[in-house]
Amino acid sequence: MNIYQDVEHMLMEAFNKVLCPKEIGKIDQNLINVEPPRDKEHGDVATNVAMVFANKLSIKSRDLAIKICNELDRNDYVSAVKVAGPGFIIIKLVDEVWFESLEFILKSGKDYGSSALGTGKKINIEYVSANPTGPLHAAHARGAVVGDALARLLMKTGYEVCKEYYINDAGSQVDILGKSTFLRYQEILGDDSIVIPDGHYPGAYLKDIAAEIVEKDGNKWLSRSVEERSDAFRKYSVQMMMEKVKADLNSLGIEMDIFSSERSLIQSGGVDSVLSILEERELLYEGVLDPPKGKQSENWISRPQRLFKSTLFGDDVDRAIQKTDGSWTYFASDIAYHYDKYKRGFYEMIDIWGADHGGYVKRMQSAVNAVTFDEATLDVKICQIVHMLKDGKPVRMSKRSGDFVTIEDVVTAVGKDVIRFIMPVSYTHLTLPTKRIV
């Protein structure tokens, strides 16, 4: 039972009496909106149906709306109906409609809202995917809740859903994380001269990781080579941070199905494989990028790079996939990652990103189209920023400065249910006062 679908049927019945069926057939009914009015005091349902039909049939929308209202007024389920503005129709339903709906919901129990819409279809939803360089902070909670809510809705409609977290463990930031942990390790072992350099991670959470290493291994790493200890501290730091991430997600009632590693993808030849596909399709070339629009930087140097012809697939400019030093860009490994999803049988993909990644959407969608020969689709949902206020002033959350409010802090203060309730509306900015949380 769906009240808004029932109203649509009522509207079509009214139109059959006002207009002939041939005229109705000319209209794209997807343009018709049947939804709650902005002001609930006006009624239960608002629709633009008269305006859509009038525009296509060269009829005055308000005149058509009045005719429809006259027909709807005879319906037993309609308590009142009126025309607003240029031709909007506002409908108030009789109480019995809502009583029947509530009765249907109670009888349906957990099955209410279920459908077979996605039966036989697989879909991959990737969300959160924060760098493993610190605990999840309050801003990550929004993408986490939006992604989880969407996954649950899709499962409710019959889709086979894979909830995935991409671990960005291949970049320089995880090397810096390992170095930062080693500095804390030296500090715990009695080196009073330790100073955390700029650009490293000063957060106290690394002291806990370093303390665990001391408890497990003692001071053995002080005598090991830089290469050996760097690799060990990087691996252990990422491992411990991901355990913390999983615990934070669980505290929100979120369990991922898969955690995929960027480093493992690169080491297994994933990037080389996907770029060979682009090479075969003649979609790579050596070129020079123009300076970023709207930015004047004295440090900008025009240099030849390996570029992907993303403009052929709707992007604004072609994109670099390999740097002049031969290393891959983040974009290259992201292409490989999405191609890996495709190889695992996911032809429909959804990514939940923060607002700061909005400019990355076109290039990623163009890459997915290119490497899957348009067989797969990528839909990106953007979550707007979560602002934290301290003493009425915005706080810029940064792991490298150590200044952020963690998900653990927020869950402890208000509980997971409150967070899950306020976070899902992803398209508006959200402001949280830290005084009430920490």
Q: Which ranges hold each PLM region?
A:
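NTP-dependent nucleotidyl-transfer catalytic core
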Residues: 16, 26-47, 52, 59-433
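N-terminal low-complexity segments that are often proline-rich with Ser/Thr-Pro
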Residues: 434-438
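Charged, compositionally biased N-terminal leader segments and the immediate start
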Residues: 1-31
